[in-house]
UniProtKB/Swiss-Prot annotation:
Component of the SRB8-11 complex, which itself associates with the Mediator complex. Keywords: Activator, Nucleus, Repressor, Transcription, Transcription regulation. The gene is SRB8. InterPro entries: Mediator_Med12. It is found in: Nucleus. Transmembrane segments: none annotated. Residues 1-22, 524-550, 1501-1527 are annotated as: Disordered. Residues 7-22, 539-548, 1505-1527 have a biased composition (Polar residues). One of its GO terms (biological process) is regulation of transcription by RNA polymerase II. This is Mediator of RNA polymerase II transcription subunit 12. Pfam families: Med12. Component of the SRB8-11 complex. The SRB8-11 complex is a regulatory module of the Mediator complex which is itself involved in regulation of basal and activated RNA polymerase II-dependent transcription. The SRB8-11 complex may be involved in the transcriptional repression of a subset of genes regulated by Mediator. It may inhibit the association of the Mediator complex with RNA polymerase II to form the holoenzyme complex. Belongs to the Mediator complex subunit 12 family.
Length: 1661
């Protein structure tokens, strides 16, 4: 307004004087400058007229000129601005009158007087009665309310058909427009409404994800685009589905729209996961920092995007979680051939890192594993709730830990080292540490949360020790803590359950158990052809053909056989001892406190200890030179068993352990049927005494208390014929071999019982004198020029105890003499060799390495001079005896290992010597060995960011780290931990040690300089110029010159001249290798061929090759390969045999004659390592020699010239490679020759065992140590006996053979855990099935039950042998147990077998509910155990038989459940109960699957289906993949099977109504959330309520019909009763929940009419 005062006066009063001062013009001006109200006017008829619309100027217009808008009022008025043009002008003229201008616009009253209305009358009526007043007012108010409600429901309510929602259409855009559209989408400032009118065509699946990531589109907009794309795709699918329906008159019932939606969502999830997988694999290719930053940014976006999709349910959660776990499995070598090779390497004897080399071409992509673990942590809460996912996760985590731990590492600060390793799978040490740490923490949490998810029988044989290591190596918990005790208890239970369920090892190569050498060959073949599908028989043939050039005929069948043993199996313990795989698991089984609740193994530790003692002294095991195996075992018992005990009653446990050892030794003297080596027994006793495991006084007290020597030998003239004579002689021999001086009790017994007495003191003094003259004096005077065994013959013939005493005296005397020496002492290889030979002669290499070598290398008095040659010899000796060095026990378990100290000293001495001496030795192999032997990383378990655990790490658990690699059966490793307790004067820390080792590994090859070459040529008086060695072009000529000169003077060289000559040759070899690798060997081949053609003496030729191996010009395998390729054409067969077997086995006399002392020692080490690491090649070489003999292979040169060494090799090879041994012999020898040869191997030279009539004699000598040979012998005998027999005759003969064996068997240990279970493992599958059938029939039909209600009758069960002397239950228990875990084929179940099982079950059930006391409990335990094992063996075929024979009532299943709840199993037999429980779960799964897949099976039709157990389950495909063992029951969904009517499936849940044996989780209280928590982890609230989808799909939102009858009965509203209406839950899919991008009110994805929504449109008053 132009004049405010005029407007105010105009509006405030109608007084004429208010405008007296105003002119007409002013008033007119005021009319036109008045602001128009912002509130529009709403006509009454606009909502009901669909033809009317609102113009852009917010003015209501009509499509028809005759229409008039009516506005609500008591007296409807008309807005002239909305009238047609003609009428509007008329109305305007009416308003332009003087009255309106003077007084303002006003309406006249409708009546002349208000009193003329009915108001007064109505008011009087209302208030005339107080009782009626309230009711009427209330009713009037209700009418007024209803009028408003009616207006909102009828007039203002949003109509359903007003919703015009639709997803943006997909249009084809040019590249530039598409890019612009995506750029606008990524711009948060650009309104979504501007671009939401269309979508670019072609954006879907992986392209969609890639565009979102690359454009970095905000998450909210990314979700909008994703929903639009997904919804569009679904609509297309639905249209296709609808279009096909009319064409199919009989559609499949389960092919519904819901099925399409499920498949569609899974396909989208698969695309997303696949993109994530490929993206994760690219992580390893990022090497530039800029690309790394881009990659991390994209990864961060992807994680946020996937998290949003998961929360908003825009993917299939079950499918997604299952798929991300596949990242962990992808790339792992888990094929059948892989697992066989892995198991072979776990049994490997070699110290070299064989498994690391095997992993050379396996790409364990760390990117996919890191991202998978990240996603697992993100969705951890959901995964933890699903047992089947937790089970798969636990298995995959353990497998990943198993492999990642073994792959090599490299230092990120060094590029050369990584290149040197040449491993595609190599990880940086930091990354490997973090990966293992994350996996370890996750496994720890999973195990403590729910131990049942670790029932993973398929790969248990691989990962069981990994699980033990992770859980038991936590530095935060002491060994005897409550938590660790409970963990060990649960581990035993988990181990039992997994080992019991390991049936039909489908993931293991079926033909056999691949030995380690075959595995190495397969690994080599893999590098060439990348093929992993070779069986052992084929590999054997290939090896044989490649080495011998001959063809092996296919005469031996490939039987499905696999050795799978439980960890506590006696044969498994022996196998560990044979391979010296001495880990914590074995140590735990030897600790007296390790007691199980099972009646079977109450004293198992005693049995296990007896096995260890017997293994050390049995005649069937050769303990290598110097009794090294015995020394290793004794040090293992000291360090890993006794020093590892930390419980309160440690002294009593050690005393019990000592008493048990003495009891075993004492009983040995009284056993006449045990074949032992007496000398080994004496060494064992002396070493145990030296380690203070046993004491002599305890043995003497036990001996005296026995009363054996109570009677004087002269008291009875027939004493020599007394039955105790053998025992007395054994004990007297032990006393004479004890390391005691001046022991009155021992001397008294020996004087009394030996004719000439035994003077310890005299022999000891004489031995001291000899050692002083021959060793100490010559060493101190630097005149040690040679060593002669003859001079120490007296020492060699002394008793073992005196040898040990002399070793200790010499060691102390040498240390004292050298320390006090006034002059320098030179230590050369000859001295090292002489000292080594003496200590080996006295069976005391422990002291040699632990004390003497350490003393020499430390050189604390600085009086010892040691050069490179001596240091290299020491290094090679340590490598040769590393397993002994590894286990040498210190003063306590916390002390640093001898191996690590020696490695440190070698490096320190090398660094010192390298400044003043040339290195022409192959020290690179030494550094590589140390690198493999020493852990490169810090511990990956039980870490803490603070320093609170430092002390624990420094003390007890430090040695758990030192021995960390033992538990996984990889090369034995030590841990150079920086927290190792250091001496005050020891500043050489583990970090410095690691850095020095890295530098040495990267050091370049050194060549001789010109000065050295000139000096060498001058000293050797070679007629050649320096240029021949300095110029590469002349290097080939220099090799020929040196070799010709060397061979000419071989045998006449002094040691100095020979060393110089070899230095020149090695220098030329290095020069050639630096240019063209392999050319040196080509030159040598030509030289050897030319040399052989000159017809030199074979002895001189052998000496040359020995020298070349000693100086490592040739490695043994390189030399033998060269000789096999060139010499057969040049030498006769006899000459070739003499050459190769002298190089392989050697003659000590020839070695000492042609080699220097130290060279002979080096050659022995080289031979030992070659034969051990290439035993297959040696075996095939011997087979070649055997096959060349026309009559019998006993005439072969090898057996004649090297009989004892060849037989020793075959004994060892038959133990480690039994199947290969058997197949190889069968290919080159007749059965009669093989039988004679096998008899020789078990020391039977007279009356050999060769037919079924000899089996009683064989049964009496079979034991666990000669089992491999006896297995092969029994196989050949049975093959000969059953040849040309039909099935019935074969079974009868087998029954006869089995009766003879069972009637004559003897057991040194226990019958329930013996050799018998594997005695028939190498028979054909047909014969094994027949034997199984015989034993099953015997057990099910002949077992006698005595069950009575009479309290005076003892309830019992037994199964006697045919001669009535032996109860066979424990023997058959061992057989069925080992058959069940080693069988590969499915065993069929006949009706007769099922009938026998059903009858037997009723008897067992009766027994299990009776009172059983005393020894009968053991028989009952064995009976039920055997029965369950038979069920496990028949499990796969038993399912169909149960359905066929018992499908109507399932009596068999019900009886099994009754057995589960029986009195015997419910009390003190937890293991049996758990085994039956797991078996029932497997049977339930199998029966359920069979019934679902066979809906027409003959089952009760009136049983209903309980589908409650089907909730929270993935599809069957994912179930079978994630849960291959089938222990997760009831997780199948009918729509994923071809079942037309799911209701026909019986109600198995009611039948299998069983509860877990133990539903408590005792370890849950120890879970530490901090170990698995991370910033990305979604909380339960986010997973359950975090997304918009959860807010809308809340259970409180329901659909009800709208109330539209508000005015239908106006005056009855107060009395209206509520009617019950049906409720329906409101639900909307996540992809349907789209953001409203339009401007219209009701064009969103949710129709507002569903909420009875209305608009409020009120005109201004």
């Amino acid at each position: 307004m132009s004049k405010t005062k005029n407007r105010n006066s105009l509006l405030s009063s109608h007084n004429r004087t208010s405008v007296s001062n105003s002119t007409k013009d002013e008033l007119l001006a005021m009319k036109y400058v008045m602001d128009k109200p912002a509130i529009p006017l709403y006509p009454l008829n606009e909502l009901s007229n669909s033809s009317e619309s609102i113009s852009e100027q917010n003015r209501y217009t009509s499509n028809s000129s005759t229409d008039e808008l009516t506005y609500p009022d008591f007296k409807p008025w008309k807005d002239t601005t909305h009238l047609p043009k003609g009428k509007s002008e008329v109305e305007v003229e009416k308003l332009n009158n003087e009255a309106y201008l003077n007084k303002g616009y006003f309406e006249g009253p409708s009546v002349a007087n208000e009193y003329y209305s009915a108001r007064n009358l109505i008011q009087a009526s209302l208030f005339s009665s107080s009782s009626n007043c309230d009711k009427v007012l209330k009713e009037l108010s209700q009418h007024l309310v209803n009028s408003y409600r009616t207006r909102n429901e009828v007039i203002n309510k949003i109509k359903y058909n007003s919703n015009k929602f639709k997803i943006p259409p997909r249009v084809t855009l040019t590249a530039s427009k598409k890019e612009a559209w995506l750029r606008d989408l990524a711009n948060p400032d650009e309104p979504l409404s501007n671009i939401s009118n269309k979508l670019p065509h072609g954006i879907k699946n992986k392209m969609l994800v890639d565009i979102l990531c690359s454009k970095n589109i905000p998450t909210s907009r990314a979700l909008w685009l994703t929903k639009c794309v997904l919804y569009s795709e679904l609509l297309v699918l639905k249209k296709k589905y609808q279009s096909r329906l009319p064409n199919n008159p009989h559609p499949v019932e389960n092919t519904t729209s819901e099925t399409f939606e499920t498949q569609w969502l899974q396909e989208w999830t698969h695309q997303l996961v696949d993109y994530f997988y490929k993206f994760s694999k690219d992580m390893c290719n990022i090497t530039i920092q800029e690309k790394k930053q881009v990659y991390l940014t994209k990864l961060n976006y992807l994680l946020n995007y996937v998290q949003a999709l998961y929360i908003e349910c825009l993917l299939d959660k079950s499918f997604f979680l299952t798929s991300i776990l596949k990242f962990l499995k992808e790339g792992l070598p888990l094929d059948q051939s892989h697992v066989s090779e892995l198991l072979a390497f776990s049994r490997s004897e070699g110290e070299e890192s064989s498994l690391d080399k095997w992993l050379v071409d396996i790409d364990l992509n760390y990117g996919q594993r890191l991202i998978s673990i990240t996603l697992v942590k993100m969705f951890w809460k959901d995964i933890l709730e699903l047992d089947y996912l937790s089970k798969e996760l636990s298995e995959l985590l353990l497998l990943n830990y198993y492999f990642i731990e073994r792959i090599p590492t490299y230092n990120t600060k060094s590029s050369n080292y990584s290149h040197k390793q040449n491993h595609t799978a190599a990880l940086s040490s930091t990354l490997k540490l973090k990966l293992l740490s994350s996996i370890s923490d996750t496994v720890n949490y999973l195990f403590k949360h729910n131990t049942n998810v670790f029932i993973i029988p398929n790969y248990w044989i691989l990962v069981n020790e990994t699980l033990y290591k992770i859980l038991l190596s936590d530095v935060a918990n002491s060994y005897d803590s409550e938590e660790q005790t409970e963990i060990r208890k649960q581990l035993k239970l988990i181990k039992y359950r997994n080992e019991s369920l390991m049936l039909s090892m489908k993931d293991v190569q079926s033909s056999n158990f691949v030995d380690v050498n075959t595995a190495r060959n397969l690994a080599k073949d893999r590098r060439r052809s990348n093929s992993l599908q070779q069986s052992l028989s084929q590999d054997t043939k290939n090896n044989y053909n490649s080495i011998t050039g001959k063809k092996i005929p296919n005469t031996v069948e490939n039987d499905n056989y696999f050795i799978n043993r439980n960890s506590d199996d006696t044969l498994n313990i022996i196998d560990q001892l044979d391979r010296l795989k001495l880990n914590d698991t074995l140590a735990e089984m030897l600790i007296p406190s390790s007691i199980s609740s099972s009646p079977d193994n109450f004293n198992d530790w005693r049995v296990n200890l007896k096995v260890v003692i017997y293994w050390a002294i049995t005649i069937y095991r050769e303990q290598m030179s110097s009794s090294e195996g015995i020394l290793i075992i004794c040090n293992f018992l000291k360090r890993k068993v006794l020093q590892n005990i930390s419980v309160k009653n440690v002294n009593s446990i050690k005393a019990e352990f000592e008493n048990e050892i003495l009891e075993i030794i004492y009983n040995l003297a009284h056993c006449t049927d045990v074949d032992i080596i007496d000398y080994n027994l004496y060494v064992l006793i002396n070493e145990l005494y030296q380690l203070k495991v046993i004491t002599i006084s305890s043995y003497l007290r036990k001996l005296i208390a026995s009363g054996l020597f109570y009677v004087s030998p002269s008291a009875d003239g027939a004493q020599s014929h007394n039955e105790n004579n053998s025992s007395v002689e054994t004990h007297l021999a032990i006393l004479q071999n004890l390391p005691v001086l001046n022991n009155k009790q021992c001397d008294s017994i020996l004087r009394k019982w030996t004719p000439n007495g035994f003077n310890f003191e005299e022999k000891f003094e004489k031995g001291k004198l000899i050692l002083k003259e021959e060793l100490v004096d010559r060493l101190m005077s630097n005149s040690f020029d040679g060593y002669c065994d003859e001079k120490l013959t007296y020492i060699k013939n002394l008793k073992v105890g005196l040898k040990f005493l002399l070793v200790n005296w010499l060691t102390n005397y040498l240390k004292t003499s050298i320390t006090k020496s006034p002059k320098l002492i030179h230590i050369n290889p000859n001295i090292i060799t002489s000292l080594y030979n003496f200590y080996a002669l006295c069976d005391n290499l422990t002291v040699f390495f632990k004390v003497l070598i350490k003393f020499i290398l430390r050189n604390e008095g600085k009086v010892i001079i040691c050069y490179m040659d001596s240091l290299y010899l020491i290094s090679k000796l340590i490598i040769r005896h590393f397993k002994l060095v590894k286990f040498i026990a210190g003063k306590s378990y916390e002390s640093t290992t001898t191996g690590y100290e020696l490695f440190k000293l070698i490096i320190l001495n090398y660094k010192d010597l390298s400044t003043r001496d040339n290195d022409y030795y192959n020290f690179s192999d030494v550094w590589y060995f140390i690198d493999n032997a020493v852990e490169k990383n810090e511990p990956t378990y039980g870490k803490s960011s603070d320093g609170n655990n430092d002390n624990a790490l420094k003390h007890k658990n430090f040695n758990q780290l030192l021995f960390a690699k033992e538990t996984v059966d990889s090369p034995m490793r030590i841990h150079a931990n920086s927290n190792t307790p250091q001496k005050n004067n020891d500043s050489y820390t583990a970090t410095v040690f690691r850095n020095d080792l890295d530098l040495l590994l990267e050091a370049p090859i050194k060549l001789l300089n010109n000065t050295d070459i000139t000096d060498f040529i001058s000293t050797l008086e070679l007629n050649v110029s320096n240029e021949a060695f300095n110029e590469i072009s002349n290097t080939e000529e220099s090799v020929i010159i040196i070799m010709e000169y060397y061979f000419k003077n071989i045998g006449e060289f002094t040691e100095l001249h020979e060393n110089l000559c070899m230095r020149l040759l090695i220098n030329s070899k290095r020069s050639l290798d630096m240019t063209t690798r392999g050319i040196f060997f080509d030159i040598m081949k030509h030289f050897i061929i030319n040399l052989v053609r000159t017809k030199p003496g074979i002895e001189k030729l052998i000496t040359l090759f020995k020298k070349l191996m000693c100086f490592e010009v040739y490695q043994p395998h390189e030399l033998f390969s060269t000789l096999r390729s060139i010499l057969p054409r040049e030498l006769s067969h006899e000459q070739m045999d003499a050459l190769k077997y002298e190089l392989l086995f050697g003659n000590p006399e020839s070695d000492n004659k042609n080699l220097f002392n130290d060279q002979a020692l080096v050659l022995r080490c080289i031979r030992y390592l070659y034969v051990k690491r290439h035993s297959n090649d040696v075996f095939i070489t011997l087979l070649d020699s055997f096959s060349n003999e026309k009559e019998t292979f006993f005439n072969s040169y090898a057996l004649k010239a090297y009989n004892s060494k060849v037989l020793s090799f075959f004994r060892q090879f038959s133990i480690s490679n039994t199947k290969f041994f058997m197949d190889g012999l069968s290919k080159v020898a007749s059965n009669s020759d093989i039988i004679s040869f096998l008899n020789l191997l078990i020391y039977i030279s007279e009356e050999p065992i060769g037919s079924s009539s000899d089996l009683p004699r064989l049964a009496s000598i079979i034991d666990e140590f000669n089992l491999p040979v006896c297995q092969v012998l029994i196989k050949i005998i049975i093959m000969n006996e059953l040849r040309d027999s039909n099935k019935d005759k074969s079974i009868e003969k087998l029954r006869y053979i089995l009766d003879m064996l069972l009637n004559n068997l003897k057991f040194h240990f226990v019958s329930y855990n013996s050799y018998f279970g594997e005695l028939f493992n190498y028979l054909s599958w047909e014969h094994k099935l027949n034997i199984l059938s015989i034993f099953e029939h015997n057990f099910l039909c002949n077992t006698e039950f005595i069950v009575s209600d009479d309290k005076f009758t003892e309830n019992s069960v037994c199964l006697m042998s045919s001669d009535g002397r032996t109860n066979l239950l424990s023997i058959l228990k061992d057989y069925f147990k080992k058959f069940s875990v080693s069988s590969l084929n499915t065993v069929t179940t006949s009706k007769e077998v099922f009938h026998n099982l059903s009858k037997f079950l009723l008897k067992v059930l009766q027994l299990a509910n009776a009172d059983i006391i005393g020894d009968s409990r053991r028989d009952a335990y064995n009976t039920i155990s055997i029965f369950l094992r038979i069920l496990i063996i028949h499990k796969l075929s038993l399912t169909s038989m149960i359905i066929e024979q018992d499908g109507q009532d399932l009596h068999f299943i019900k009886n099994l459940i009754a057995l589960l709840e029986s009195k015997f199993l419910c009390f003190n037999n937890e293991k049996l109960r758990i085994l039956l429980y797991d078996l029932l779960l497997l049977m339930k799964s199998s029966i359920t699957s069979s019934m679902i897949l066979n809906p027409d099976s003959n089952l009760a039709d009136d049983m209903t289906t309980d589908t409650s157990h089907q909730q929270h389950s993935p599809s069957n495909d994912y179930l079978s993949r994630s849960n291959p063992d089938g222990t997760e029951v009831g997780n199948s969904n009918s729509k994923y099977f071809g079942v037309s009517n799911i209701s026909t499936i019986p109600n198995l849940s009611s039948v299998f109504n069983i509860s877990e044996p133990n539903i408590s989780y005792p370890l849950k209280k120890y879970t530490d959330d901090s170990k698995i928590l991370c910033a990305l982890m979604l909380e339960e609230s986010e997973l359950q309520k975090g997304g918009d989808i959860y807010a809308l799909n809340d259970s409180k939102l329901i659909l009800l019909p709208s109330r539209r009858e508000a005015l239908s009965s106006a005056f009855d509203i107060l009395n209206e009763t509520q009617q019950t209406v049906s409720k329906k839950r409101f639900k909307i899919e996540s992809y349907e929940l789209l953001e409203d991008t339009g401007i219209e009110l009701n064009n969103g994805c949710i129709n507002l009419s569903l909420f009875d929504a209305f608009t409020t449109k009120e005109n201004p008053p």
